Amino acid sequence: MTAKALRQPAPLRILSNTFLAFWCLIAAFPIFWITVMSFKSPVDAFDSNPLNVIFGPATRADGSGWSVVDIVLGLAVVYFTARLSARHLPRLVERYSPKGWTVLGWIVAALLVGVGFVVVFFGALPVVTGVLNPLLGPLGRDVIGATTEHYQTVWVDRGFSNNFKNSLIVTAGVVTVSLTVGTLAGYGLARSGSTLAFWILIIALIFRSLPHSVLVAGYLPVFINSAEWLSPILGENAPTLYGKPAAVIAVLVAINQPFTIWMLRSFFSNIPADLDEAARVDGCSHFKAFRLVIMPVMWPGVITTGLFSFLLAYNDFLVTSLLLDASNQTMVPAIAGMFNRETTTTDQVVAVAAAVSITAPLFLLVMVFQRQIVSGLTAGAVKG
């Protein structure tokens, strides 16, 4: 079928493009609005006039604002960070990662990009604009009121960095365990034609459909009494798992593991079994063939599955709020705790700044892995 035959009529193209543009605006508006609010004083952030929220006259009157130079250079830093990461990062990771450690290479690369962006955007950029603004006259005058004091409050004064660290621990643990078990189980089930493999998949699907609260209730007595149960083995040093990140990792892995097994099994099913046989002929064991031949082909699927596992652990509220104490709380329950009847408008803007902060790693993750995610979803959707 030719390209001309596949081309949509002009009215239909206009209608579909208009609808997609409108839907994108509707979907992106909440993120855009809370981002704008997080840089304003409480007076501007909760003003009934949308223009005052955007331009922040009260914030600018307090001596906090951005000039045209600030805005242009800030957008340039964001644009070039995204563009250079998407274009060069996959090639650099592939070149410099040790053989068999590509995932670790991606994690290190993502951390380096994130740290570098924070250093440039919040460290070097204010110094540069502070020198340029007095020299450029009208272009150096504040045109939009903006302040970063709410981010300083939430990360420095409120100790949100500790919540961020706990989220990283939980997320890294869930993703690591889920992918390790999921790849092995998915590969075995994809290569097995027995009836037992079918029933294992059905049982996994049943466990996946259970409400999260049911699993939490089942694990709760184990975690609370863990010190008593482990004391015959570990003696007086037996730990209480309740309130610790390890408890949350165990529950979230139990919730997420059926999904990862199902998804990875579908990816492995699309890889011809001839690759396994060829590797076996060349002298590889089953595990060596899996590690050196199958897994390099599977990386897009593994990264896609890992992204969904990351989102489950990173955004979880129910399990983390029930099983973690205040000192080990992750970011999502910590933000929810900032909203209560006693909060002031300043506290609410601080909570908004915290909410914006937790979305930044998600954008960075999708930006860095966009090609692998699209490739993995395409591979999982097409058989053969």
What is the predicted function of each stretch?
Residues 1, 90-103:
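Membrane-interfacial, low-structure loops and terminal tails that flank and connect transmembrane helices
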Residues 1-7:
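Short, Lys/Arg-enriched, disordered terminal segments
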Residues 6, 12-91, 114-384:
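A structural signal for multi-pass alpha-helical bundles of membrane permease subunits
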Residues 97-119, 207-208:
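Transmembrane alpha-helical segments of multi-pass membrane proteins
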